[in-house]
Amino acid sequence: MEKIIEKSIYASRWLMFPVYVGLSFGFILTLKFFQQIIFIIPDILAMSESGLVLVVLSLIDIALVGGLLVMVMFSGYENFISKMDIQDNEKRLGWMGTMDVNSIKNKVASSIVAISSVHLLRLFMEAERILDNKIMLCVIIHLTFVLSAFGMAYIDKMSKKKHIIH
């Protein structure tokens, strides 16, 4: 009976598979990326420097979110479902198979901080059109992300130290 329960629990990890496949639909961001590029090309020479910086920040934001999607999909699949069998080691991403759950959390947290930083920079560039309390709220949210990322990294570092000592 115990073996059946253990096999069932172990097999249930495959219930996460649709979640990781579903994340790939987030790559619809690619369409947004190219849509922004296509719409900016005719106006690029007439655009102000700050307007161009805002567009570039938008593109960077999309790239960061896309990278976050790849990292979560690949590492989540490898950590919780099955190792990816990639025959050609040259095509295998260097970090694949090396990230444990804590390092994934730290990478996700730092990616969220980077994405939040881009949003905050974009907000500051349009500060004259935005209410002060909205800017303050965004800064507070960003600082919360930063403190959370530091906290998670600190906890991870302390838990690794504890394992070395014991």
From Swiss-Prot:
InterPro entries: UPF0114, UPF0114_bac. Keywords: Cell membrane, Membrane, Plasmid, Transmembrane, Transmembrane helix. It comes from the Bacteria. It is a multi-pass membrane protein. It holds the Pfam family UPF0114. The keyword Membrane applies. The chain crosses the membrane at residues 14-34, 52-72, 135-155. One of its GO terms (cellular component) is plasma membrane. It is found in: Cell membrane. The keyword Secreted does not apply. Belongs to the UPF0114 family. NCBIfam families: HI0507. This is UPF0114 protein in repA1-repA2 intergenic region. It comes from Buchnera aphidicola subsp. Rhopalosiphum padi.
